[in-house]
Amino acid sequence: MGSCQSNENSEGNARNKEIEKQLNADKRAGSSIVKLLLLGAGECGKSTVLKQMQILHSNGFTEEEVNEKRAIVYNNTVSAMCTILRAMDGVLHLPLENGQKEAEKAIVMKVQENGEEGEALTEEVSRAIQSLWADPGVKKAFEMRSEYQLPDSAKYFLDNCQRISEPGYRPNDQDILYSRVATTGVVEVKFKIKELDFRVFDVGGQRSERRKWIHCFDNVESIIFITAISEYDQVLFEDETTNRMIESMQLFNSICNSTWFLSTAMILFMNKKDLFMEKIQRVNITTAFPDYEGGQNYEEAVAFIKQKFAELNLNPDKKTIYMHETCATDTNQVQLVISSVIDTIIQKNLQKAGMM
């Protein structure tokens, strides 16, 4: 993404410093603002949940934000195809079924080689991506995606390539929800509900990012921990020897039982339930949990994973874990879950204030 990425990084650094400054000021002032912290391992869907909150409670996206996301959508679309093509060559050793499409492969790969994947898709590039996406060899490589690192949004953007490449394209809310750029530092959304001011923070999910920020949030009202239950057969982007589900459970364990968060409510979003529902029919969760003896179906497998997370809570008498199965890209479903979460928080605040 070239200069687009570097500009985002510099702007992000300035924003991170401002947020940290405000957090420290809030702490000194003993602020009554309701602070929620989104945590989870990389690519679990935290940023998507935060964007949903922005759509539902914070007047959506500004024109400037929409323009920024346009470049990210272009990038995600080109990168998705390039990632599949590279995996076909280097990991899967799969050829294109139609050898005549090698020229189209070269067209798409050249966009990334030139650092132009954040630019508007030309008609030539769009046609090449759509043609490659229809190739049975590419489809087979997509089905084998757990063997390499491919974002969950790849299918969405490749399916929508023609629309995305149209002149005057403007990302809609769904495009923005699916768009993906790794969170570095802290991203914040503010909104007001029933006279309460909410501040929600998304902390970068990769290991290095988490270490930088966790100490800043010892006074948050609740932690929304997000785990991608569909990733039980995948490894980390930053460590390809570690199973993503196991990493998520280890992180949950450290947060749930941390001295920083002894009195903080824990809300667990078991995210990507739609992908889990599809995958469980093909891949058993014994991949991550050899002790699982239940059926290869959604209900039994999810119940088992819930129990695994519940067992990590070392203080169940004092700390309740509220669990929700979610699909972060489904606005209607997320709205119901977030409303339930916010109602719970409001009730707790009223109890603290002695009004219940």
UniProtKB/Swiss-Prot annotation:
Any one of the GO BP annotations: chemotaxis
SUPFAM superfamilies: P-loop containing nucleoside triphosphate hydrolases (SSF52540), Transducin (alpha subunit), insertion domain (SSF47895)
Binding site for GTP: 40-47, 177-183, 202-206, 271-274, 328
Top-level taxonomic group: Eukaryota
Keywords from the named record: Cell projection, Chemotaxis, Cilium, GTP-binding, Lipoprotein, Magnesium, Metal-binding, Myristate, Nucleotide-binding, Olfaction, Palmitate, Sensory transduction, Transducer
Region of interest (G2 motif), residue spans: 175-183
Gene Ontology CC annotation, any one: non-motile cilium
PROSITE patterns: G_ALPHA
Subcellular location: Cell projection, Cilium; Cell projection, Dendrite
Keyword Amino-acid biosynthesis: no
Binding site for Mg(2+): 47, 183
Domain G-alpha: 32-356
Residue ranges of the region described as G4 motif: 267-274
Location (main, coarse): other
Lipidation (S-palmitoyl cysteine): 4
Stretches the record annotates as G5 motif: 326-331
Subunit structure: G proteins are composed of 3 units; alpha, beta and gamma. The alpha chain contains the guanine nucleotide binding site.
Chain's role: Guanine nucleotide-binding proteins (G proteins) are involved as modulators or transducers in various transmembrane signaling systems. This specific G-alpha subunit plays an important role in olfaction and in cilia morphogenesis. Involved in chemotactic responses to attractants diacetyl, pyrazine, 2,4,5-trimethylthiazole, benzaldehyde, isoamyl alcohol, butanone and 2,3-pentanedione. Displays a redundant function with gpa-3 in chemotactic responses. Involved in avoidance responses to copper, sodium dodecyl sulfate and linoleic acid. Involved in osmotic avoidance and mechanosensory responses.
The family this protein is said to belong to: Belongs to the G-alpha family.
Protein name per its UniProtKB record: Guanine nucleotide-binding protein alpha-17 subunit
Gene giving rise to this polypeptide: odr-3
